A protein has these predicted regions:
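N-terminal pre-catalytic segment of deacetylase/amide-hydrolase enzymes
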Residues: 17-36
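Structural preference for beta-strand elements that scaffold enzyme active sites
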Residues: 34-36, 61-65, 85-91, 156-160, ...
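Active-site gating loops and adjacent loop-to-helix segments of metal-dependent hydrolytic enzymes
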Residues: 103-129, 264-267
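Catalytic domains of cell-wall/extracellular-matrix polysaccharide-remodeling enzymes
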Residues: 135-212, 224-229, 239
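C-terminal domain-boundary segment and adjacent tail
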Residues: 187-190, 262-313
Length: 313
């Protein structure tokens, strides 16, 4: 019996890295259920920033992604720099969806003319970006956003895409892949089942071949029936999570006049904030199931370690 732990360790060490799950490579068990709860649209407005900070500090949120072109980006960067243990990624932006609250590119306008509507803002909808813009313009703009965040002192932990612009069409997915490789960052990724349903089964393997890491599953298919449905839908959806790493996202908000003036979704965003920050029931559900909440930082650090090792002769 005394020799069993040593034998187990030896067997563990000879298992090829490729045969291990991402959870195992992070030091967890293959059967563990790990959950990333990401706050999207942070930096969009002051209310969103304050809601995200509250949820990160005393709620269930484990990471957030920032909208660099938006007016309240400097505020959340200042918080991130003062709180380096928090995980902040970039919510890459090529659209500006609200009617009276708009934003445009970080890159020079003459480098991304196809991303601009007649008023000089980003287009409102993803299909408009595909119809008017080009993947090269999307790459230029996304790169400018990442570089601006780095120049501001943000320790970026991951990437995702606002309104999915970089996550649907193959040419834009390749832009997403290029950025992940260039800046050595993990990414939000659709599930294998979703890619297969869309007729694009090879993308997860292509990112993995470049050493890019991403969660095992991504939940993005909830359809709310108003703010009253938010809690019950998440309680059902987060029951019996699969082993491995699952990512979900929310848009945390509070019922301020600012948010009400920006979007008609303010009540749903407020309900998401309450469910994931102040309501004890969802927290208790996750605890009963043994779900472990994690952020993107350990995934990023593992990715960089593995890619650095692979690059050495």
């Amino acid at each position: 019996m005394p020799r069993l732990p040593s034998l187990f360790l030896a067997l563990f060490l000879i298992v090829p890295v490729q045969a291990q799950t991402l959870a195992e490579r992070l030091g967890f068990l293959a059967a563990d259920k790990l959950l990333i709860i990401n706050g999207d649209d942070v930096g969009m407005c002051h209310t969103g920033n304050q809601a995200a900070i509250a949820s990160l500090e005393r709620g269930l949120m484990t990471s957030a992604t920032l909208m660099v072109p938006c007016p309240w980006f400097p505020e959340i960067v200042a918080y991130a720099k003062a709180n380096p243990v928090r995980d902040f990624g970039i919510h890459l932006v090529q659209t500006s969806e609200w009617k009276t609250y708009r934003w445009g590119p970080v890159a020079p306008w003459d480098q991304v003319p196809g991303l601009l509507d007649p008023e000089g803002y980003f287009w409102s909808e993803t299909p408009q970006v595909y119809a008017k813009g080009t993947p090269q313009e999307a790459l230029i703009e996304a790169r400018a956003q990442i570089r601006k965040a780095l120049a501001a002192g943000l320790d970026i932990t991951h990437l995702d895409s606002h309104m999915g612009v970089l996550q649907y069409l193959p040419a834009y997915l390749d832009v997403y892949r290029q950025l992940a490789v260039e800046f050595d960052l993990p990414v939000r990724m659709a599930s294998q089942a979703a890619f297969e349903a869309g007729g694009q089964p090879s993308w997860r393997a292509r990112f993995a071949a470049d050493g890019i890491l991403f969660p095992d599953d991504f939940v993005h298919d909830l359809k709310y029936e108003g703010p009253a449905s938010v809690k019950s839908l998440w309680m059902r959806r987060l029951t019996d999570l699969k082993p491995g790493i699952t990512e979900i996202y929310i848009h945390a908000g509070q019922p301020t006049e600012e948010l009400k003036a920006i979007t008609g979704s303010w009540a749903v965003r407020s309900a998401e904030f309450e469910t994931f920050t102040n309501d004890p029931d969802l927290r208790a559900l996750l605890e009963r199931q043994g779900v472990k909440r994690i952020g993107y930082r350990p995934i990023r650090d593992l990715q960089r370690s593995l890619r650095n090792s692979r690059a050495k002769p």
